Amino acid sequence: VPPAVWNSXNYNS
């Protein structure tokens, strides 16, 4: 599974 950084500010932002 991908790290939280993926959904933190890379994809959501």
Swiss-Prot record:
Q: Which UniProt keywords apply?
A: Cell wall, Secreted
Where this protein primarily resides, as one coarse class?
secreted
Where in or outside the cell it occurs: the entry states:
Secreted, Cell wall
Q: Per its UniProt entry, which superkingdom is the organism in?
A: Eukaryota
Asked whether the UniProt record includes Secreted among its keywords, one would answer yes
Sorted alphabetically, the Gene Ontology cellular component annotations on this record are: extracellular region
Name of the protein: 66 kDa cell wall protein
